[in-house]
């Protein structure tokens, strides 16, 4: 309860600090100190001072909300409510609901029952699946609505105050609804399948669950550029023939095959700049923000793309997918051990009781927090590899330096952070380190 109140009130607290309200008066220009050290812009520092506590709060409060929901008995109450709903029993305060529930939920149970192979129907029923699905959807909707004020403040109001958002409030809300819908479908499939496996294979479920985890993550990587991204952006093939020729020449020097190049209309949402490689196999493609094409020189764009090609060359996406899959698979065995020893204390009917989902999500969140230093260290290593590849292939250290100076201004990025913050939170090396790498590369080339 306390954690939920913190989530609801924290946007007001951040607003009362006045940081966002004064952002328009701050300069976004970086400067150099007398000793030659690059200094972050006042606006970037203000944004960082706002985002850091918000990020820490989001990390820590979310699992506490879930634990509170579990230990208070509310999770058990929600499961009982969902069971009554699935059985078409009367719900308090809902007039005329039983007949409607029997008709519509009866159809749902029938459809879900037909999804179960006959050999499995003695261990898992259509009602089991329906209860799990309804519980998951309601929990996801409840937590999303709880975080809606926080999300709206952080990703819309703050973005407008600091001048990098180009969205209207209705457009932001529509994106939020689409994102929630995708999450409901994905979580519904994943967690309903998870609880079905717990019923079918009480002892061996981590083995098929791990395989499914790796397979589903591969499917997500494959379909995201084709099905998900177009829901949020207008996408069109790169039309600039001269830039296409430069990209193809760059890829040829890097020993890579590139055929699909696309541009997304990031300018419809923000002024932020980026480019990335995505997908596997035939879905693999280069994606450029239109903000990159309109505000940067061809040499700077080439440096960005060379960096992204470095990720491709070193197979960072593939290695990340395999590493995350292996870690997740091992984690499933740890989760089995934990569930077998804690379900009775939580008042659950067994490990396969969907009422234990908040507990599972909280455990996953805490483990993810503990893993941040290792995960982000590997990410920074990969980014340094890609930076070095970019310099080695493009041979444009001056453009590299100019690029990151512009990034610091346009993306309102601080150029350096305390070491503890870099270790725990940063997925990329500080901008000063990346510029220093380019300066060292230029000095070595001039020798």
Language-model segments: residues:
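Polar-ligand-bearing catalytic/cofactor-coordination segments
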Residues: 2-4, 11-93, 100, 104-352, ...
